[in-house]
Amino acid sequence: MSINNETLRNSINDVEAGYEYMLAYAAQGLIDEPTSGGSGPSLRVYLERMQNGLLSIADDFETVIKDATGDNAELYLNYLSVLKEDAAKSKKAVDLVMSLPSIGSQVIDNLNASIHLRALLTDIFLIDEALTSLSRHQ
């Protein structure tokens, strides 16, 4: 993440860290969610952080876009509507998984494969890179 905005960076990190943790969790082949043990945060902690990031990421990007793009703001804001939809859809998927009494690896593997979550990550990378490119030429 190259944009220098701590709030946005935190939202992006929450989403990306959740995704990365889910990849490792899915690979474990767990039928049920561990109830104790282990070192570090649990899956649910990562998913809760991810939920928070998904709630705020579009608004956080909007703030940065309005500050950074000037006359091109409309183009970025138009694309931001796509990111907002993907974030909302991804959050609904995470909410569904969080509602389960126990979360197994297969459910997380399916969440990882969600086209909405993958689209959101691509949206984030595209807007970030576009803003970074723009800042180099201003």
List where the protein language model places each region.
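N-terminal intrinsically disordered, cationic/polar leader segments
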Residues: M1-L80
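Short, charged/polar micro-motifs that form catalytic or ligand-binding hotspots
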Residues: N5, G40, A73, L77-L83, ...
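Short, well-ordered alpha-helical segments
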Residues: V82-K92
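Amphipathic alpha-helical binding modules
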Residues: S90-H137
